Amino acid sequence: MQPSGTYTPEQFEIMVHNLTDVVHGEGGTARGIGWNAPYKIAGKTGTAQVKGVGQGESYVESRTAEHLRDHALFIAFAPVDDPQIAVAVIVENGGHGGSVAAPIARKLMDQYLIGNAGPAVKVSVPTSGDAD
């Protein structure tokens, strides 16, 4: 990949390395999708808060109405050394990006890059009636 914008080549390489660690690093928030990938993925997980949590309060998903639960986000590109696909996945009220949105992105990238998305990916998405 070639750097663009106002970043130096060194800064660009650091960013790509860090994004790759999100998926392939030991403590990466999307490491669950990278362990058996036949190509390197660079990505970033995210969670978008829907309902504000007041000072002194804590967010408890099981006690939050489904329509007020956090959105799950994941953006990625692959293969890192020769990018051919970029994806952005948003799962409304899905929870965490690494466990919900990232597996969906991996399936999309597998299908595009190797023509086989493999077995279905299990994601835990909230169901109606989990909260009031």
Give the label of every model feature segment.
Residues 1-4, 10, 16-119:
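Active-site beta-strand/loop architecture of penicillin-binding DD-peptidases
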Residues 113-132:
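Gram-negative outer-membrane assembly/targeting C-terminal domains
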